[in-house]
Amino acid sequence: MAAQSSLYNDDRNLLRIREKERRNQEAHQEKEAFPEKIPLFGEPYKTAKGDELSSRIQNMLGNYEEVKEFLSTKSHTHRLDASENRLGKPKYPLIPDKGSSIPSSSFHTSVHHQSIHTPASGPLSVGNISHNPKMAQPRTEPMPSLHAKSCGPPDSQHLTQDRLGQEGFGSSHHKKGDRRADGDHCASVTDSAPERELSPLISLPSPVPPLSPIHSNQQTLPRTQGSSKVHGSSNNSKGYCPAKSPKDLAVKVHDKETPQDSLVAPAQPPSQTFPPPSLPSKSVAMQQKPTAYVRPMDGQDQAPSESPELKPLPEDYRQQTFEKTDLKVPAKAKLTKLKMPSQSVEQTYSNEVHCVEEILKEMTHSWPPPLTAIHTPSTAEPSKFPFPTKDSQHVSSVTQNQKQYDTSSKTHSNSQQGTSSMLEDDLQLSDSEDSDSEQTPEKPPSSSAPPSAPQSLPEPVASAHSSSAESESTSDSDSSSDSESESSSSDSEENEPLETPAPEPEPPTTNKWQLDNWLTKVSQPAAPPEGPRSTEPPRRHPESKGSSDSATSQEHSESKDPPPKSSSKAPRAPPEAPHPGKRSCQKSPAQQEPPQRQTVGTKQPKKPVKASARAGSRTSLQGEREPGLLPYGSRDQTSKDKPKVKTKGRPRAAASNEPKPAVPPSSEKKKHKSSLPAPSKALSGPEPAKDNVEDRTPEHFALVPLTESQGPPHSGSGSRTSGCRQAVVVQEDSRKDRLPLPLRDTKLLSPLRDTPPPQSLMVKITLDLLSRIPQPPGKGSRQRKAEDKQPPAGKKHSSEKRSSDSSSKLAKKRKGEAERDCDNKKIRLEKEIKSQSSSSSSSHKESSKTKPSRPSSQSSKKEMLPPPPVSSSSQKPAKPALKRSRREADTCGQDPPKSASSTKSNHKDSSIPKQRRVEGKGSRSSSEHKGSSGDTANPFPVPSLPNGNSKPGKPQVKFDKQQADLHMREAKKMKQKAELMTDRVGKAFKYLEAVLSFIECGIATESESQSSKSAYSVYSETVDLIKFIMSLKSFSDATAPTQEKIFAVLCMRCQSILNMAMFRCKKDIAIKYSRTLNKHFESSSKVAQAPSPCIASTGTPSPLSPMPSPASSVGSQSSAGSVGSSGVAATISTPVTIQNMTSSYVTITSHVLTAFDLWEQAEALTRKNKEFFARLSTNVCTLALNSSLVDLVHYTRQGFQQLQELTKTP
């Protein structure tokens, strides 16, 4: 056998290499197809365009999908190609493939058989692709006869031979694997025959049929090999095949081998769908090493054979996953039966072997369904439905296998942890590919492949919760292949919720692989309809997750019961026994519900996502569905459509009720997805993945830890269900609110199990906040934001719990989710505003906080500060002084101007400068905060700056910048309102309000920045706006009403003082230019004087004229002009710099001339309304040409209010 195994391993390696190349090529082709679907993938993101975080995620996810493709190119490509070759159809048409390959009448059974056959065809796809269709349908239909006829003898022979042969070789392993599976089924007695034909349909007989199909379909050998291994071992452990002791021994040997092989297999479990492809592609050497270890054992051959042929199993895996779920459902009922001493014996002896084998089988994905079919589950479930009975059988065998697998995987987890390193690579790849944070959570518990296998199990386990690990992995693969059909059958599944439970596990795997990311995001809402039924399995599964930390096999039991984790097999039987009620009932629909399962997969992907093995299979499936990943947006829609089919279930309602939120969640999921790859690669990564999956994983994990800690499987299931299926609905909503949930989940979840993931979640939120508020001062705003989000997160979390508690609460949750979506949108808007103004607002709040201290010192500083403001405006020094004193109070009596500004900048600048930079635009929104900050009361503390007391106002720099943005926003709002008005007078009034806001913005800008350029531009634009206002109507005409004349005075005074402010901004430059120009003209005048004597016409005027020029720059300019005109100056060239300087100088000085001119015009109009302005000056202050802009705004606003009152009164 060892020699054969080595020979066959070589053959398998060759086949693997060939298939790898073929799959890589096909994968590349499919990848090319993926880009075509990329737009679909982008669509979901488009829904969340407004969300900065979502857009980042979109970018990340898009890149990640590509990376994921590359990472899983080998596995994915192989799987995709294998699946395509096997089914001769695209991965996505898995359901169509099933339908096309298998008659619709026997579609479910065909799916099982085909999936079983397809595994073989997958490997055969290399050389037996043509055989696959033939085998699939013939076996699907002939299976019954084959089953009945050859179930006992041929199957037993095949089993024995295959078991031994698998030890011996891999190519023969196909046939032997099938036979072995049949043999195992034979041990199950004629179950294999019935199961082949009725594997989905007939519960008790159907356990063997999957193996029979495997047997008949030698193409399915990869699965059959893995499945046979598990079957043999599980039969032995479960006592199903006492006569199969040789096979069992072979299985045991294979199991023994499998632990080592599981080194390969664990690598395979991560990419369960096509673990062999990923293993060959990733670790052919690894597989060979395990081969060296396992060669003596049958498992080695299986592992290599499975690996090569597993590649083609993507669809088979999905299809078989379909079977698996059926198997798993009965597994619950049968688990008790299957929990036999043989299991304990086999567990002890072949726990590791079984774990490896089951892992490999899961990887192969063809075995678990047959194994599931073989075992007692048929008895457990047959009563429920004829089809469910098959499913029950499958589930029961799966459960048996799972129990064995659990025990073996528990033991094997230890042994496999050694393999863990190799598996970890695959797992990381598959995890990253899967980008399933839940998978990642399980992954940390079982970093090694065996955990991944159990992890893969949880998906089906979540569905079946008692399915064997291999069954689960198979169900994962089946779900991968059948998830699409499942999503359609999910509708029927919802109709037959009790039946669907078993099928659900399968879809989770598919979803895990791709749909998990896609459907989980979108389809999960659809899945929630099943949520109530699948809720229990997910809830238990969370607990199983928790136990998976201790033992991967426990995950299986966990799926059934968190407390039974230790005795995963026994506990599983009870939980699964209930689930058979649910899932086995659903099983018959599963047969009818290939689409439904997909939906189920959508729901459960969260849970399965945790399984690393499932992650691996997902990687493979994702390889197949990678195109789907890209078109995930479409897939989300499709899945949504499927859920719509499922509309019967609440998830549909949730999806339809909150369709838009569901899309953002999908983007968020993509977000999670993108972040998941890295997390899945590292344990710390899983936490990030959780963060990414925040909604999914945090709920999932938080719920899982809770359920684990709580121990009650249902409590865990409830939280898990909310995280998984109801969480699908919730996640539909919660994903909408994913951002808030991460924080909430972080708080809730971090304490439970994934404290780091919450931190990661916090980090993510922090990243958003960081981008907006990077500095510590921003932390307050971040905390506030986090708090804002977290309370909703708490609500969301609680709502999710409620949804898990009762599906009836799903509607509430959806409403809550919708509200949360609104809240999330609000939060996002708030984040944007906060990013702009929260930094400012945080600074405002901080300043407000500091202001309390300021007032105390304000009294003293008011006394101290009044002088500085007086300099700017003696009339209103007190107000500026108060404002300054407040800010200076912060400075603690330091230099009011610089020290206050420096202290404030120290206080807030650390965060505010960046905030301002980031929030330059947002600072306008901070004007809203301005009122809250308390600056509004003294909105013009900086105005003194224009008066020349700019430094005293500088302490307000942070406030000012934030205020500047707020004022700018307010000004633009007013301006837009004014533009919409038709009445010219009303429009002019509204424009004046905008002018005042613009002036305030300029004041804040001037006080905030050292440079006066920005303030100067604001003032300049404001002056232009005032000119436009004055052009709307001749307000200053003699015939104009008194109110309009008053309005004209206010406008002209604003314009005049603004011109003075503009001059002050450029005063230093004007003085500098004046000196330079004077020097230049003096030198030029001297040069002109020399030739001037020769020119009589010139006379002394031209030479003398330059002399007075120093006195007045204008005179110097004129004299220069005269010199030029004299003709002597014609020879003198004026430097360009001088020309520019002169032009700038004239422009700057013209502001003063304009200001005086306008002021005189305003004074003339003021005389006609002395009473009004006298009262205004008394109430506010006397406005002068050198008044500060703060005084101007205060004065103008007060006068404008009085003017409006006068306008209303008449």
Swiss-Prot record:
The keyword Acetylation applies. Keywords: Acetylation, Chromosomal rearrangement, Nucleus, Phosphoprotein, Proto-oncogene. The modification N6-acetyllysine is found at K681. GO terms for cellular component: super elongation complex; transcription elongation factor complex. It is found in: Nucleus. Component of the super elongation complex (SEC), at least composed of EAF1, EAF2, CDK9, MLLT3/AF9, AFF (AFF1 or AFF4), the P-TEFb complex and ELL (ELL, ELL2 or ELL3). This is AF4/FMR2 family member 1. It comes from Homo sapiens (Human).
